[in-house]
Amino acid sequence: MHDWVDADVIRHAIAAGLDDPALGSRQQWAAVASYVDDRGDDPWPDRRAMLAERAVPCDELRAWLAQDVATAAPLMGAFTSHDTTIEHAAVLVDPAEVARVAEWLGGRLGLEVSVVDARVVGGGFSRRMWRVELLVDGRETRVIVRIEQGGMFGTDTVREVHAMRALHGAGFAVPVVIAVEDTGGVLGEPFFVMEEVPGVVRLDEQGLDDIIRSVADLHELPARVLDDSGRSADQVVHDNIDYWRGMYREHAPESPLIEHGADWLHEHLRPTGPSVIVHGDAGPGNALFDAERGLTTIDWEFAHVGDAAEDWAYLALIRGRRTMDPDAWKARLATVAGVEYSQEQWRQWLAFNHFRGACVNLTARTVFEAGPRRTADQLAIGVAVHLRFLSQLADITCA
């Protein structure tokens, strides 16, 4: 493994991306070009030599990190983020790909399936997504196809579908999974087909309160719906730290600040209550409102058993910052759902979320390097967004 993504790989991605709008806009690729043209020589070989010779203190590690963040700044400009106001360009799905899916789905259902329209859904990062209008035995049916991207974020179809079906069986409002292809034999990656849920993203007062209530309702479900291991809450916390640490080690050379962060979390992080089912990406954008169906929660690839504070800290202190400041979120959580933590608990669980983000975002770099569909967002996430989370982690664990 190398510390930097090879320049030739990046330049090939730029050339391909300029011919395929599904891989990124021209503005994004211009930012990527600025990054690769101006980043200079990789400082990490010299840093690795220093790490082999002596223990490098946190202050020096953070100085290195600040240099890396400055170098990667153009890539932050290429990242589309979770901004729900962004309008993504309408991109048609490759007819050959969607035809293969329709043929496969028809075989699975034992029905005649044909494609009326298929378009790329923008805004998601863990999956390629299509919005597809089908005729199933002559009946119009609208579905979403979620396709893996080489292990992006360390998530997979089997676990996501298991979580969705388990939660649906427990009465929680999730999209119905119609069919699963877990071999990669149709599209080269596993995927599943689910119902297209009607609804819109809401950021008004009532909409935000409904999101909070939905997360609270999720936490009220028995953890055994997803995990019947009977582990203690303490064990779950330590297992989750080790899970994310193990993931980053599969995708990048050793990071002294991530290792330090993991050790800090093992020493300081404590459960705030019994283990619950955690969404892992809760907040505006992953909740759709419909007048008839009410609220449906989507994007379950991160669902797992953990501490409720993981969801609340992510919502209030990270994902929800575009909507309200952290203090406003904390006050609303207390009023709507009775969620209250000490300042130290908020700090600890914010650190865990930054740790998780620093680890998981490195998978995007692997996906970008491996190809063949290299997007501007993959590189931005695997480099610049990773460094942002790592900086925020170090602000807490190296303080």
Question: Which role fits each region the language model picked out?
Answer:
Residues 96-112, 220-280:
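An alpha-helical support segment within catalytic cores of ATP-dependent transferases
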Residues 2-34:
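Short terminal alpha-helical segments
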Residues 119-242, 246-257:
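ATP-binding pocket architecture of kinase catalytic cores
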Residues 6-9, 16, 34-41, 309-341, ...:
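Active-site activation/catalytic loop segments of kinase-like enzymes and analogous catalytic loops
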Residues 14, 42-77, 86-91, 328, ...:
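ATP/Mg2+ or Mg2+-diphosphate-binding catalytic cores
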Residues 112-119:
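Conserved N-terminal boundary motif of the eukaryotic protein kinase catalytic domain
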Residues 19-26, 40-44, 55-61, 252-255:
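Charged, low-complexity interaction regions
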Residues 1, 119-134, 139-140, 144-145, ...:
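Active-site acidic catalytic loop and adjacent metal/ATP-binding pocket
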